[in-house]
């Protein structure tokens, strides 16, 4: 969702009020995500802070400005093959099945300036004498702009350096 936001003109520095947001789901019913984060309630926080702190309210705010169908489309563009993804407002919190390989492949777009590199398990085949019988190159596809990729790198670093991912540094 944050990548979709960056692709649609949002910036990591954009400020959002840290309050509960209620969206209308695909059945016309109100949907309000719960939030474990009790910091800065009512204050203005940045989009980057929202991702760094895994904040469901900021995520819901972004979904209110975007579209679950566009999010589903972007998820597939990033190489996720699951066709059972439901384009609902709750998709912003990530309730869909994605394999580790798909996740790794999707995340390659950020350090590669928006180009996703598909997993490649065999790079070449040789015979017993070392002669190369076949070579294989990874499939690459531009999935987001260079600008969005850079903004996502900034925000993902904040997850580890300032937010909920800090445990991986210890």
Indicate where each model-derived feature is located.
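Active-site-adjacent helix/loop patches that line small-molecule binding or acyl-intermediate pockets
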Residues: 16-21, 34-112, 157-158
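Short acidic, glycine/proline-rich loop/turn micro-motifs
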Residues: 28, 86-89, 135-138
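Short, glycine/proline-biased beta-turn/loop segments that scaffold the active-site neighborhood
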Residues: 1-44, 118-131
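A penicillin-recognizing enzyme superfamily signal
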Residues: 11-12, 49, 53, 99-105, ...
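Short, charged/polar low-complexity linear motifs in solvent-exposed/disordered segments
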Residues: 30-31, 77-79, 135-136
